[in-house]
Amino acid sequence: MKEPRIRGGLPLVWLWVLLAVAPGESLAKETAFVEVVLFESSPNGDYKTHTTELQGRFSRAGATISAEGEIVQMHPLGLCNNNDEEDLYEYGWVGVVKLEQPEMDPKPCLTVLGKAKRAVQRGATAVIFDVSDNPDAVEQLNQGLEDPLKRPVVYMKGMDAIKLMNIVNKQKGARARIQHRPPRQPTEYFDMGIFLAFFVVVSLVCLILLIKIKLKQRRSQNSMNRMAVQALEKMETRKFKAKGKVPREGSCGGLDTLSSSSTSDCAICLEKYIDGEELRVIPCTHRFHKRCVDPWLLQNHTCPHCRHNIIEQKKGGHGPVCVENSSNRGRQQQQQRVILPVHYPGRVQRTGPIAAYPTRTSMGPHGNPITVLTVERPLEPDLYPARTPTFLAGYRPVSLDHASSGHHCDLEHPPYPAPPAGHGFRRAKYSGRGFNNGTCYSQYETMYQHYYFQGLSYPHQQEVGGSQAPRVVENGHNHSFHSGNNMLYQPAPTLMHMAPPSSVGSCYLHSQHQHRSVCSGYLADVPCSDSSSSSSASSAQGHASSSDSMLDCTEASNQGVYGSCSTFRSSLSSDFDPYVYRSRSPARTGGGDAPGCGGEGGTGSGRGRVECRSHQTFPNSPSRDRLSSCSMEMNYSSNSSLERRGAVISSGTVPDASVSISQGGGKDRRGPEKGCTCCFQRQAGDPSSDCTNLYLGPDPHQTSGPSSSGGLYSVTSSILHRTDPGTVLGHPSRPCCLYEENHGSCYNEDYAVSIQYALAEAAAAAAAAAVAGCEAGQPIPIIPEDPGYDGGLECVGHVSWEMEGEEEEEEVLYCQEGPCCALAEETRALCRSTGKEGAGSTTGQDCHPTDRD
């Protein structure tokens, strides 16, 4: 109902506005502004001016223009005469006529319009009529003429007319100025009202804008504060634990604590952390007192140390969470799984990549973040089907059965795959090689922060038929893998280290760390007792110790997280690969003197470690750095990632072992590396040589024939067990931690071998000599440790396992025509080979170095 009324009232409003404005505009146009200036003279001759402003109306009988002139009063009767003989005034005057009442006008007389015309004819610039007594004169003037006058005709009445007549009657001299618009005022160009109105409007607009901006900023600030509070609530807090008090159990309770191995003081208040004090761990892994950093985070939203924005990472991970539900756990593992190579302290092992999951992150001693990873083992293949990574897409899954591996130790040995034929562990710059791996590695796995090793790359699939798979036969036992519950992929093996078990109450990590959490960082050797300085009896017990420094049990976990403090041969000037760390093998000698194999050290239980019969101490090596035939040392070449010290000069021979050495394309064997101590059990009646003899020269069985150019061969006993003298090789099963090298090639960064040189004609005498040491012999590395050497060694070699016989088999490594024999021409040293008195099989050797530039 209201809407029609409004629509009907709008035309009326507009009509009223037009009616109000139109007369105003017409009146504004017809208004005549008369300014009268009076001149008064003083006795001294000065003149004073007085200005009087009056208003009148322009009539239609004249023009609407401006006029100015001296005021001349004219009597109305004087304009009634049409006589032209009257005196005429000069042009430029303004005539003022006061009209009388109509009854008083003489007749005949001119009309009002005729009087105006008569005044203009006599020279008036304008005519002003006072119509106060004769209102009908206005109608006469507004009737208009066909030919209006060219000068203005103005009529006045009321107070303005009275003022004008007073000035004319009393003053002798006055001047009038008629304008059709009001005269300009000094304040015309500055109107305070308009200015105030404009100022108020602008001020209101600015105030509204400021209020709007302020409200927007406040809303944004409140939103940021809310986000900061939410991020702070989701941020993890941990309680500080002093060194040695960090729980070792693989539960979520252990993840809520921080050890003192990293920075132990707050960067804000510079106070030391107290045991049990609550710390705030920022997603950038920096930690501070909760009371110190929370106000800063709420106000600035950034880390005080690295300016990391916590709001941007609010949707990221917020600390470890224990997932009890199996489905959630499987989904989380699929999203966070990382396939990484694994590094085990102790000795070299090769296995495929293992899936691991980030558990928590802490800071290392140098400010680098170290992530604790959890190893994934597919214990429930039915619930969690394995997903093949991209680089493992073409590899066949292998089902393993640990029960058929023939292992004899009492450790838990997870199933471990053997690589198929053709799947080699290849290098980036050199040709590949194949390895056949055992399955013995410890339950506690230490994953290192460095994921790739220098010079190594992932394998490439090679099309090899199933008939080309390497045969592993030992003493009639075929170590085949049967089907089991655990499914592992078998890509090319990856370098790993592990710590061997210990049999004497030293806290081996297998017994104390049953959880799956592993630490990233350098865990050098993980020993718990230093047996390097013990007697020969204690040195026979299995442990993995560094020759420079040891760790206690309380520092084992911190060592795994923040790096080993017993860095093997670590120095700022050393030139080794920092990403590949190897400790000594279980067969490393521990004492200062090398006990014989038949000594007290060899009479321990089956778990004891038996040393070689004699070890030669070299002048240029540390007294505690002794090598055995199964020792693994750190690589000192910056270009290498693997280093194998294959053989050591020994004083024993190989009794009851038929030696078959082939030059050229013959089958080669190499003594297996000794792994865990369980594989070193000796059985009575198994005589074998304890040390590997490495010779440079022609085949001892071919001394009568023409000698080839400086070939390198090694005579070892097949699958050597540490046995007492006089026993024979006879363990029915193959050691699980031995590995074989298939299609091996010689590389200058792969092997550092201590050798002996002997003349061909002195081979028989050298074989017969049974000397405990070689005073004149010096250890000569075959390949100089030249970091800048990039050329690959084109040694032709083929290592494989084949059945030589039911009772005995040998292993020969042959390298023909390669730079691995290049130092022979430089040294030309004569060294004798040692042998066992009364040996059934005598090894002779010649040293025929090849002369090369």
Curated annotation (Swiss-Prot):
Residues making up the signal peptide according to the UniProt record: 1-28
Disulfide linkage: none
GO cellular component: plasma membrane
Keyword Cell membrane part of the UniProt annotation: yes
Transmembrane segments: 193-213
Keyword Ribonucleoprotein appears in the UniProt entry: no
Physiological role: E3 ubiquitin-protein ligase that acts as a negative regulator of the Wnt signaling pathway by mediating the ubiquitination and subsequent degradation of Wnt receptor complex components. Along with RSPO2 and RNF43, constitutes a master switch that governs limb specification.
Entry protein name: E3 ubiquitin-protein ligase ZNRF3
Gene: znrf3
